[in-house]
Amino acid sequence: MTDPERTIAAQATAAGQGAIAVIRMSGPGCMDILKQCTPAAFTERLRPRRATLVCIRDAEGAAIDQALVTWFPAPASYTGEDTAEISCHGGMLVTDRLLKRLYQCGASPAEPGEFTKRAFLNGRMDLTQAEAVMDVISAGSDLALKAAQSQLDGGIGAQVDELKDNLVHVLAHIEAYIDFPDEDISPDTASDLLARLRNMEEKLDTLLKTAEGGRLLREGIRTAIAGPPNVGKSSLLNTLLGYDRAIVSNIAGTTRDTVEESIQLAGLALRLIDTAGVRESSDVIEQAGITRTNRALETADLVLEVADASTPRVKDFPAPVLTAPRLLILNKCDLGIHPDWKAVPGIRFSCATGEGRKELEEAIIQAFSSSLPGETGSSLVAINARHQHELGLCREHVRLASESISRQESPEFTALELREALTHLGEITGAVDTEDVLGAIFSSFCLGK
C-alpha cells in the first residue's frame, strides 16, 4: 500500500558507472530533506522547473558531490507531489552516499514503480498510461515504441472513455424505466438502445482484435529458423544479424542448441531462433538439440524453413504440427537452382551474396500484416493481455444486456449487465481498481520509475 505521507527516493538512471546519474525524490518532505543536506538558504534559491547548482553534504558537513537540483512543486510534477531531481556525477559510490544521506534525512527507499503509481493515484495519468510508461522503456522496435507512446498519450484510455459514455447513456435510460415502473420501454427507444449496444460490440471487437498484434509488438515475433542439417540455417541467422553469431561449418550437426538473437525489421522486433538441424540421429546430444528445435517450432510465431536449393530435393524435414506461418527459403541459389526446386514456390536466397533479402523481409511483413495493430485516427492501438481480459468480459455483459432488451425482460436485469460492463471498463483505466491489480502492474517497473 502506498503511503502518501511518505517521501520516497531512488536512482532514476541505470545503476552502474556513468557520466551523470539522476536521483529522484517525491513526497511532502522533499523540501525539508533538501534543507538538511544543503547549505543554509539554498532552498530559497530554488525555482520551479529550473536546475540549481549546490554541494550536497553529509551529516558532518563534508561534501558528497556537486549536483544540480531541479525542483517540481506539486501538483505540476510527474507524481503530482513535491518532487526533486538531483543530477550528480554517475559514480556508484557517489550515488550510494547521496541516497544514504537522503534516507538519513527522512526519505524512504522507493518501491519498484512507486513514482508512476503515485502519478496514477494522484490523477496525473490513468492506468493504461501508467502501463505505457513501462512499454516505452522496454520497446524493442519502432512500432512497439509508437504504440506505447500512443497509449501514453491516452489513445486507449480515450476509446475506453467513449465506450463508457455510451454505456452510461444507455444505463441512464434503463434506470429511468426502473424509477418509473408504470411505463414500458417503447419500441423506438428499445431499437435506439439496441443500436447503441451493437455499435459498442463492434467497437469492442475492433479493440479485441489488436491483442495479438500488441503481444507481437511487446514480445517480438518469435521466428524459428529450421530445416535439415547443413542447409545454411546458421548462415541465414548471421546474414540477417549482419555479424557472425552462430558457428558455421559444412559438418552436419554443428548446431546442437538453439541460438537466439533479436533484430528490427521494418519497425518490427524479430526474435530469431537458430535451431539444430532435424534428422534421425543416434547422438544423444544431437537428439537433445532436436528436442529443443521442436519446442521452438511449437512456440514460434513464424517459421523460416531453410532448404539447400542447389541439391536434389529430399522429403520434407520432420517437424511437429505447426500453427505459425511458414516461409520456405531456397538457400544457396548462387550455386544454381537444382531442377527439383525450380517449380517450388519459395524465396530464392543466398547467404553468400545477400540475394533475396528484400523479398524475405517483404514476405515476413506480409505474413503479419493482418495481425499487427493499425492506425485509429492518429493513434496506433495495441491492447495488452489485461486489457483483453477486461474488454472481453465487458463485451459479454454488453451482449447479455442487448439480449435482455430484445427479450423485453425487466429493466433491472438489463441494468445489472450494464453496470457489470462499466465495472470492467473501469478496471482498464483504473477508475475501478484493486490493490492486487495495481501491485501486479507496478511491481514490474524499475526502482526510479
UniProtKB/Swiss-Prot annotation:
One of its GO terms (molecular function) is GTPase activity. Keywords: Cytoplasm, GTP-binding, Hydrolase, Magnesium, Metal-binding, Nucleotide-binding, Potassium, tRNA processing. Coiled coil: none annotated. K(+) binds at residues 230, 249, 251, 254. (6S)-5-formyl-5,6,7,8-tetrahydrofolate binds at residues 24, 85, 124, 449. Its EC number is 3.6.-.-. Mg(2+) binds at residues 234, 255. Transmembrane segments: none annotated. GO terms for biological process: tRNA methylation; tRNA wobble uridine modification. Binds 1 potassium ion per subunit. One of its GO terms (cellular component) is cytoplasm. Residues 220-369 form the TrmE-type G domain. GTP binds at residues 230-235, 249-255, 274-277. Its cofactor is K(+). Exhibits a very high intrinsic GTPase hydrolysis rate. Involved in the addition of a carboxymethylaminomethyl (cmnm) group at the wobble position (U34) of certain tRNAs, forming tRNA-cmnm(5)s(2)U34. Homodimer. Heterotetramer of two MnmE and two MnmG subunits. Belongs to the TRAFAC class TrmE-Era-EngA-EngB-Septin-like GTPase superfamily. TrmE GTPase family. This is tRNA modification GTPase MnmE. It comes from Akkermansia muciniphila (strain ATCC BAA-835 / DSM 22959 / JCM 33894 / BCRC 81048 / CCUG 64013 / CIP 107961 / Muc).
